[in-house]
């Protein structure tokens, strides 16, 4: 039976890989995507890099939607009636959240709250996946798990923690399976130029062409778990198609110093 998948933030790297993952497993399913800055040709070009078959506008439907407006979100949910929802939307820069007067915090929490209200009001029977973040974790020298201590140190992480706590309260209510993926850093060829790995790659390319550039980054001693966005999207898909309400850490399990 044909299923409908709603992906918020579909044009980001995770959304692109997730779209590909869903259609590889279920080519007849329908994907509904939302984006604040949708460029059809750019999105299709990136998707075609990953897929070996063409899609049409009936299979993938993407629209500019303001998820900060509750009425708009209610209409989106009632009109589409998705079987699976993946909330990947919202600001993703920890650094910017430190100086944007809580805009990042407000946007992340408002988008989730609007989706939760709309789902509840529509009496949907669906699976919901929330993109959470390893930024919630307290500093630790040992391996982290779903049971590790949470201690956010930025407005971005605080927003993710608030949603994480709300999810625990929502589990078991109604016909919704609420899951979350506590994701570590992950990169791909579709990552934005403002992020560390792409900064380093672009710097190397400019140096190769003899352009004078200065690479500005933070401490080289920081240790991060970097994975591949394609692997993360595969995990997201597998988590949400299971009829369970669980939290999962998604990472490579290996830390690397930035200097490496």
Regions found by a protein language model. Give the residues of each.
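N-terminal Rossmann/SDR dinucleotide-binding element
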Residues: 1-84
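Conserved Rossmann-fold NAD(P)-dependent oxidoreductase catalytic core, especially the SDR/UDP-sugar
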Residues: 4, 87, 113-155
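SDR active-site strand-loop-helix element
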Residues: 8, 34, 85-89, 128-133, ...
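Active-site YXXXK catalytic motif of short-chain dehydrogenase/reductase
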Residues: 12, 108, 156, 160
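NAD(P)-cofactor binding segment of oxidoreductase domains
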Residues: 16, 20, 99-128
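Conserved internal alpha-helix within the Rossmann fold of NAD(P)-dependent oxidoreductases
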Residues: 70, 111-113, 236
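Active-site segment of SDR-like NAD(P)-dependent oxidoreductases
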Residues: 91-95, 133-142, 150-153, 184-188, ...
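NAD(P)-dependent short-chain dehydrogenase/reductase
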Residues: 142, 165-240, 253-255
């Amino acid at each position: 039976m044909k299923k409908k998948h709603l992906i918020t933030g579909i044009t980001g790297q995770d959304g692109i890989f997730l779209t590909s993952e869903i259609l590889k497993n279920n080519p007849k399913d329908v994907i509904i995507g939302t984006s604040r800055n949708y460029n059809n040709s750019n999105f299709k070009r990136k998707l075609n890099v990953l897929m070996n078959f063409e899609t049409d506008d009936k299979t993938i439907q993407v629209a500019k939607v303001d998820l900060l407006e509750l009425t708009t979100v209610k209409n989106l949910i009632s009109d589409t009636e998705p079987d699976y929802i993946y909330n990947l939307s919202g600001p993703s820069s920890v650094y910017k959240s430190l100086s944007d007067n809580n805009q990042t915090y407000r946007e992340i929490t408002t988008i989730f709250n609007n989706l939760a209200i709309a789902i509840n009001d529509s009496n949907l029977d669906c699976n919901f996946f929330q993109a959470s973040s390893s930024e919630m974790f307290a500093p630790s020298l040992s391996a982290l798990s779903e049971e590790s201590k949470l201690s956010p140190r930025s407005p971005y992480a605080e927003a993710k923690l608030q949603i994480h706590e709300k999810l625990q309260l929502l589990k078991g209510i109604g016909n919704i399976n609420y899951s979350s993926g506590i994701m570590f850093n992950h990169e791909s060829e579709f990552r934005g130029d403002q992020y560390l790995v792409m900064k380093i790659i672009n710097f190397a390319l400019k140096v190769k062409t003899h352009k004078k550039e200065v690479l500005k980054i933070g401490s080289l001693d920081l240790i991060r778990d970097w994975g591949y966005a394609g692997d993360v999207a595969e995990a997201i898909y597998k988590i949400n198609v299971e009829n369970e309400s669980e939290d999962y850490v998604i990472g490579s399990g290996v830390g690397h110093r930035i200097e490496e």
